Design a protein with these regions (language model features):
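Gly/Ser/Thr-rich active-site loops/lids in small-molecule metabolic enzymes
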Residues: 26-42
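Peripheral (often C-terminal) accessory segments that flank ATP-dependent C-N-forming ligase machineries
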Residues: 38-135
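Short, exposed beta-strand "edge-strand" segments with a Pro/Gly-rich flavor and a Y/T-containing core
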Residues: 17, 29-33, 97-103
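Short hydrophobic alpha-helical module
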Residues: 15-22, 34, 43-50
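Conserved metal-phosphate-binding beta-hairpin within the catalytic cores
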Residues: 1-26, 54, 72-75
């Protein structure tokens, strides 16, 4: 983030073009059918070869993601069993993550609200922030 001196507004500044982290690419694919990694590669080839890039058909569903550190090394997510779950984080110890997808925005919001409460009470781990930043 940077502060615009003339207005005092805080704005986000991206320093490079890339596919986002934190499994957001998987969430985008769940909602749109677009694999950002694949399309990035196709776009790079198109630019390098001077050919036209065409975006594939986009699905207009809704998706959401929840990710948290956990108290458990390998948390059991079996009690999250809704059919809207399209992805589960399984490769990172001490983490829980789920992506849900539906054509209903209300359903996604309802699931995320429910999951946030359940993750907070049954899984979430955090450490207090230090009094001052470490160098």
């Amino acid at each position: 983030f940077i502060k615009v001196h003339e207005t005092g507004e805080i704005v986000f500044l991206e320093t490079s073009s890339r596919v986002g982290g934190a499994h957001l690419a998987e969430m985008v694919e769940a909602s749109s059918g677009i694999n950002l990694w694949k399309e990035w590669a196709i776009l790079e080839v198109a630019v390098a070869t001077g050919t036209e890039y065409k975006l594939p058909a986009v699905r207009n569903d809704h998706a959401g993601i929840i990710v948290s550190l956990t108290r458990q090394e390998w948390p059991d997510t079996g009690n999250f069993n809704d059919p809207e779950i399209t992805w589960r984080m399984q490769s990172m110890s001490y983490h829980i993550g789920l992506i849900v997808q539906s054509d209903s925005e209300a359903r996604i919001l309802s699931l995320l609200d429910d999951y946030a409460q359940r993750v907070q009470s049954d899984y979430h781990a955090s450490a207090p922030a230090p009094d001052k930043p470490s160098l």
